[in-house]
Amino acid sequence: MVVATVSESRGTLSYDSGRVSGVTADITPDKAPLRTWLPGFVALAAIWGSSFLFIKVGVAELHPVQLTLYRVVAGALTLLVVLAVLRDRLPREPRVWAHLSVVAAFGVAVPFTLFGYGEQRVESMLAGIWNATTPLIVLPLAVLVFRTERLTVRRAVGLGLGFLGVLVVLGVWEGIGGAHFIGQLMCFGAAACYGVAIPYQKRFVAASAHSGLSLSAAQLLIAALQLAIVAPFVAGAPPLPTDLSPKVVASVLTLGALGTGLAFVINMRNIRVAGASTASTVTYLIPIFAVLIGAVALDERLNWHQPVGALIVLLGVAVSQGVFGRRRPRPVIGVGAPAAPAAEPASR
């Protein structure tokens, strides 16, 4: 799902000011102590990294479209409960719902399904690696199509490195074709869908006054409707929960309730406490957890060029996002708490 993590605003976030040396100090999130955000940061990476394991387990008994439908329904119900507890509400403007229908298709329904199809053919850890290529799609679309970003030399170099990494992950020198290669293309296609959804959301949805929770809940509701319409024609009648093994039922519930619901709450807290810039770096940990979990839980193995390519991809993403040249702001001494940095959506 496309959720707030990097630089796109989906609601105003703030944090409490503290006292330093007898004066009121507005400690910026980027200066927050590690102990206040690191546990949630690692937990979020583990939750999103484990999603690829649960997809792999789920598609063993469910059609990818059915798995996605069940997952999205579980996630929507979870966020609706959180929405009710926090006394927030869904958007009411037809224009917002119209734009969210596009985000729901490209940020939820299609990519979730493509990852399911892909993991019928490739390892879960490899799907996790492909998920990290999303920023490589976001940048050219944001520059050329949606015109929400500007291409710089640094970004161009990062983009080139990233796509070099993609070729290494694919192992193009070994030949193109076969089910495994097609599965990788499906996973890359899923990441490409996120790449469409993120700049589209930034262009048409981010300026709305609704909270990130409200927009995400609406997004999942729309995606559930889209999938419910398509599923009978593509996958036939869905099996009853009693026809599924306990591990598949648990995987579906975990994907929806934990991977979407709880993960969203954790992510919003990470942004509030640590700042959007720090919270966005969870992108680099997700494939690491995906690989570790796939190796331990499913005894999966990678070819040598796949982790090497993944490192090149992550390096390219880091260069394009200016991670190596980023400077943290200093604490501001004064009265009142400034608004936290805005957040950009990321895919899981």
Predicted segment positions?
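C-terminal-most transmembrane helix of multi-pass membrane proteins
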Residues: 2-30, 72-73, 248, 283-348
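Specific transmembrane alpha-helical segments of multi-pass solute transporters/efflux pumps
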Residues: 47-55, 80-131, 141, 164-168, ...
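Loop-to-transmembrane-helix transition segments
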Residues: 36-45, 83-84, 89-116, 159, ...
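Hydrophobic transmembrane alpha-helices of multi-pass small-molecule transport proteins
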Residues: 20, 79, 101, 141, ...
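Glycine-/small-residue-enriched transmembrane alpha-helix faces in small-molecule transporters
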Residues: 1-69, 117, 176-203, 225-226, ...
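Helix-helix packing/entry segments at the starts of transmembrane helices
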Residues: 69-70, 108, 127-133, 200-225, ...
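Transmembrane alpha-helical segments that form core, pore/gating elements
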Residues: 79, 138-140, 159, 176-238, ...
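C-terminal transmembrane-helix exit sites in multi-pass transporters
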Residues: 78-90, 135-157, 288-308
